[in-house]
Amino acid sequence: MIKVRTPRWINEPVAHHREGKALVVVTGSETDFWNNTFYGFRHQNGHFIAHEVSGDFSVELKFSANYATLYDQAGAMLRVDDNNWLKCGVEFTDGRKQFSVVVTRDDQSDWSVMRLRGKADAPTTLRLTRHAEALRVEIKDGKTWRLVRLAFLGMPETVEAGPMCCSPIGEALQVRFERIAWSDPIDRELHPN
């Protein structure tokens, strides 16, 4: 059974509150997580609800936002330290909603995107799973989970993970996290029949 400790904010946002079981967050101006690659800058001022989690686990998030400005983003993050982390979720680029994954190792970020269908403000469900040194990112497509990324990240036994959101160019992105569910890790099988 996994142990998820009481969370703390890393860069508390302008506003956040509960609406029933949902958590609503409003981002601050020019907030992001990115380390060096291509752009040559380092930003560590995005909003992250950091839960300490030990060992292997899965976390599932269902969320929506009023994405409108380039790079508006919301989703999940797993963090070892400022130089080693992963963030994944929806990012607004090229005028549309994309599924984005950034893996940062040794102070260098990479970035991958996948186009998503549907309205920009439609809810998205993702699952982030830790299997020892591997991180598995999946998105729910109807009733089916689709693998988006399988990545290596050197991690100690205990890491921080949880919801994340940023507005690298704009501000006041309103994100609604409808579901945040922690569980033991899903099966390691990548290609079930």
Residue spans of the language-model regions?
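Extracellular glycan-recognition regions
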Residues: 1-193
